[in-house]
Amino acid sequence: GHYYADGKFVRYADLTTVTEYCHDDLETVCHTIRNKLIAGVDKRLDADAPLGFLLSGGLDSSLVCAISALVLGKKIRTFAIGMDKDAIDLKYAREVADYIGAEHTEVLMTRQEVLDTLEEVISLLGTYDITTIRASMGMYLCCKAIHEKTDIRVLMTGEISDELFGYKYTDFAPSPEAFQQEAKKRVDELYMYDVLRADRCISANSLEARVPFGDLDFVKYVMSIDPAMKVNTYDMG
């Protein structure tokens, strides 16, 4: 983002331009990532309103939930959504919730609910990007249920991790530099895709989003890691 001062636009922070990679070894990198993520989660746990957690069962949201449960030292309230038939993702979210001892809520959506909400979601997103729309349907309906049926008003999410660490976007990148350029592009364009989805779906339901993986200190460090350490060398997607 930018702000206007002294007759010109000033960029708030350039998180993706790296002039020199850090020289930390793998053990140090892993240790630093862990500590910075914990710090990023911790600083976002202070809330005047009741706090909830979106839990998909994937690595990103699971880490945020697990760290939060440890830091707070009490049960956290997690929420997952899936179709009313064959909702495989709910299984993994339930396993994580059980493991960390969370107070877990499952929101089931029907095919008709998705169809009935489609036009509304497209309108609030302001985009016809198919992937963004598809990924937004569940989040919107989950946030709607949270707002209508609970007192939760602040939500922690696992967004931005995929763009930082590669996910499928950088699988089989031809070189470390190609990995870095793709990661830079993905982070620079966050406002057009994943962050757009989370921001619109959450705020449209009068909820506040908090994104620990977007912590400035965390992002700056991850982007400075030698991309050779992040390239997929396991020949698996």
Annotate each predicted stretch with a short phrase.
Residues 1-27:
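N-terminal segments that mediate ammonia production and transfer
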Residues 17-237:
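ATP-dependent adenylate-handling active sites, centered on carboxylate activation for C-N bond formation
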